[in-house]
């Protein structure tokens, strides 16, 4: 058996099924999950937590110790994977430039504990503390605090029997959620180890791995299929859950409503475009007016007209953008690319074609989202140009090999279609 995993959030049913099959031990299940899998709740402490990312439920956080990275890359084959170069709760020393491993650090402490890894380019620190999977200890006012997941008053009193004596000696103690699943004698020994670590400044081995996975539409569809083996699940369940809640439940449980209508309800007259880079950076492209749409229970096809002001150069095409120029682009839930056709606002002549290679686009309320696969194709004056191949190689550290191979496969397919004059 591999590590113990606690799973929370909208992907919990599918991920419980998957990680159970990979020989991880599932612990601290919700009542709903235990009933769905006909299991008793396994009240043991967790080594690993998998949950939705609070800032964006289209992403998953995996944190703790004991996860096998290859398992993540084999499960989420077509998603972006970011592993923090600095461990959560590790203690680091900061130089005068207030940076660490080329990341900006806030606040600029000489030494501190990492409380937020740099998934947005910045490390957030707090004062140095000793951390285990059960508790956090540091010198302070001598108080005890509790994880938000410890709410039972009897449980708090149980834990206070251990932390109050330390409070009287000037130590702060914060109990983590795992503590409520562990016997007092084990917790007492853990606190003693934390005190020694804190006083001896032995933080070298402290810290937890932290992964942030940006899910693609194909991987969400895979999770839909896994969930379907456990409970009634419609196609696009996990995508729709980012915009709807009760409507999806009603469709699945009560068979009320239409999947096609839910999908169509996400399409406004004007759609924003969320273009996600492999390193996690999000670029909001100029949105567009919906001029065509086809939607049914199996998928969607949306055509946008994006209009430009007279400023800049068309990327990859090299022609000046003039007032009134516009782009006609199709987003298709089945396609790993979008063909941008740029036209002159003066005489409607075609200026060039730019093909963006990406995961199939998701529909969220009022916007389209996809993962950009870095490599692109431009057609200018009948010449084919392969763009940013070096970027794909450089950013492949964030991609499973299956995703890199898919990007190359799509490029080869498109070049072949262009050469045969069959591009569509």
UniProtKB/Swiss-Prot annotation:
Keyword field contains Transmembrane: no
GO molecular function: mRNA 3'-UTR AU-rich region binding; RNA endonuclease activity, producing 5'-phosphomonoesters
InterPro entries: DUF402, FomD-like_sf, Ntdp-like, RNA-bd_FAU-1
This enzyme's EC code(s): 3.1.26.-
Keywords: Endonuclease, Hydrolase, Nuclease, RNA-binding, rRNA processing
Lineage top rank: taxon: Archaea
Pfam families, sorted: DUF402
Job description of the protein: Probable RNase involved in rRNA stability through maturation and/or degradation of precursor rRNAs. Binds to RNA in loop regions with AU-rich sequences.
Similarity comment: Belongs to the FAU-1 family.
The name this protein goes by in its record: Probable ribonuclease FAU-1
Name of the gene encoding the protein in the UniProt record: fau-1
């Amino acid at each position: 058996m591999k590590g113990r995993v606690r799973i929370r959030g909208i992907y919990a049913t599918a991920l419980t099924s998957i990680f159970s099959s990979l020989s991880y031990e599932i612990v601290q299940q919700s009542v709903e999950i235990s009933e769905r899998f006909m299991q008793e709740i396994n009240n043991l402490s967790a080594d690993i937590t998998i949950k939705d990312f609070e800032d964006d439920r289209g992403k998953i956080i995996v944190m703790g110790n004991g996860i096998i990275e290859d398992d993540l890359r084999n499960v989420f084959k077509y998603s972006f994977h970011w592993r923090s170069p600095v461990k959560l709760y590790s203690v680091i020393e900061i130089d005068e430039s207030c940076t660490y491993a080329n990341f900006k650090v806030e606040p600029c402490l000489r030494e501190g504990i990492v409380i937020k890894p740099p998934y947005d380019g910045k490390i957030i620190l707090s004062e140095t503390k000793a951390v285990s999977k059960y508790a956090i200890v540091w010198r302070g006012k001598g108080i005890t605090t509790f994880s938000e997941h410890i709410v039972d008053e009897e449980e708090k009193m149980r834990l206070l029997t251990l932390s109050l004596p330390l409070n009287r000696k000037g130590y702060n103690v914060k109990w983590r959620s795992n503590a409520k699943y562990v016997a007092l004698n084990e917790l007492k020994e853990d606190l003693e180890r934390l005190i020694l670590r804190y006083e001896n400044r032995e933080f070298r081995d402290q810290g937890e791995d932290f992964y942030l996975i940006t899910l693609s539409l194909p991987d969400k569809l895979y999770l839909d299929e896994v969930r379907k083996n456990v409970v009634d699940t419609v196609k696009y369940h996990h995508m729709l859950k980012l915009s709807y809640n009760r409507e999806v439940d009603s469709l699945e449980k009560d068979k009320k409503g239409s999947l096609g209508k839910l999908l169509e309800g996400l399409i406004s007259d004007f759609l924003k475009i969320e273009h996600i880079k492999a390193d996690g950076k999000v670029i909001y492209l100029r949105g567009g007016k919906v001029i065509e749409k086809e939607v049914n229970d199996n998928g969607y096809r949306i055509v946008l007209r994006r209009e430009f002001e007279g400023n800049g150069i068309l990327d990859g095409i090299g022609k000046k953008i003039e007032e009134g120029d516009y782009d006609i682009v199709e987003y298709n839930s089945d396609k790993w690319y979008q063909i941008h056709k740029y036209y002159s606002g003066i005489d409607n002549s075609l200026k060039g074609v730019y093909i963006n290679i990406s995961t199939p686009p998701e529909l969220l309320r009022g916007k389209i989202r996809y993962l950009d696969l870095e490599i692109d194709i431009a057609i200018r004056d009948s010449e084919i140009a392969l763009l940013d191949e070096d970027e794909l190689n450089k950013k492949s550290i964030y991609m499973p090999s299956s995703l890199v191979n898919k990007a190359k496969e799509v490029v080869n397919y498109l070049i072949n279609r262009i050469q045969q004059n069959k591009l569509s």
